[in-house]
Amino acid sequence: MANKQDMSKKIKKAILSLTDKSEIKLILKTLKKYKVDVISSGGTSKEIKKLGYKCIEVSDYTNSDEILDGRVKTLHPKLYAGILSKRENKKHKEELKKNDYDEIDLVIVNFYPFEKILKNTKNHIKLIENIDIGGPTLVRAAAKNYKSTTVLTSSNQYKEFIKDFEKNKGSTSLEFRK
């Protein structure tokens, strides 16, 4: 059985796709301290850069533009392979290397506020466009690979994450990831 130290997971690369950007600076400050590379989508990327932090836009990272009026932004194998790869699996490591993909260790996503929009409009088109596809898919991928990937879905989780991340010197504990 692996010891506690073996169960911590160093975070080197993160993807952020946030509707609620209210506490983003708290996360960015911590990620910068530990030299975590950040990938982010459109509005999140703009906010990160506005705050003076570095990031790479999803479209630049995947070398694939957003398509279908923004309906397809984060649905790309380079992201999902990086999130889902089993770090201890030699074949997975080889496939990542062969495809020039990196492991993604941290997924921070807030979903579109569908319920809020539903309360404020009955406009069918607006409702349909606020059904989040990419966000939940990123979260499900990270949850499936919790042994290697940390996932946050609410700014309410940031302080607890930072506490665990700092305690483990740039890693997260298996207990936190569960």
Role assignments for model-derived ranges:
Residues 10-14, 77-84, 123-124:
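Short, basic, glycine/proline-bearing loop/turn elements
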Residues 2-5, 18-23, 70, 113-117, ...:
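Short amphipathic alpha-helical segments, especially helix-boundary/capping motifs
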Residues 43-114:
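Glycine-rich nucleotide/cofactor/substrate-binding loop typically near the N-terminus or early
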Residues 20, 41-42, 89, 135, ...:
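Helix N-cap/beta->alpha junction signal
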Residues 2-38, 43-61:
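N-terminal glycine-/serine-/threonine-rich phosphate-binding loop
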Residues 9-12, 101-178:
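Internal alpha/beta core interface subdomains
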Residues 3-6, 69-73, 93-99, 127-130, ...:
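A generic local secondary-structure boundary/capping motif
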Residues 26-28, 49-53, 60, 66-70, ...:
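Short acidic, glycine/serine/threonine-rich loops at helix termini
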